[in-house]
Amino acid sequence: MRKRAAVLVLSLLILCVAPMQAFALGTNQVTNLEIGPLWVSITEFTNSFEISGSGLAQFDTSLYARSNINKVVINASIQQYINGSWQAVNSWTSTTYSNSGYLNQKWYVMSGYYYRLVSTGAVYQDDVLVEQTSYTGSSYWY
């Protein structure tokens, strides 16, 4: 029995002292993963917004979808932060009967407020809604 106990203690000691190997994923395996929207029919939805020194706010919104889509609707609004909440200053809609759409507008804004762009894009196949997405941009002081 003493012999078994000695063998057991010796085995445990070897396990504790022996170096263990651990492997991690290489950095290139981790960085290859991209975080992005999980769209099925929409392939690209881009938005840009800027305010010039004279107060001219301008935005561009575009949406591209797969070839089975035959209607694209884009809604966009310039919002102003006033009295603790965001309020639409003006809104626009673009409807195209193809698999891509584009909307750009200009609008003069009043100084002394924050402004941002909020937009939505929806794609249809034979007038049946297939997918939609939305965007809320960063706020800009003017």
Model-derived segments and their meaning:
Residues 1-2, 114:
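Intrinsically disordered, low-complexity sequence elements enriched in Ser/Thr/Gly/Pro
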Residues 2-24:
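Sec-dependent N-terminal signal peptides of Gram-positive bacterial secreted proteins and lipoproteins
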Residues 23-142:
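Mature extracytoplasmic or otherwise solvent-exposed domains
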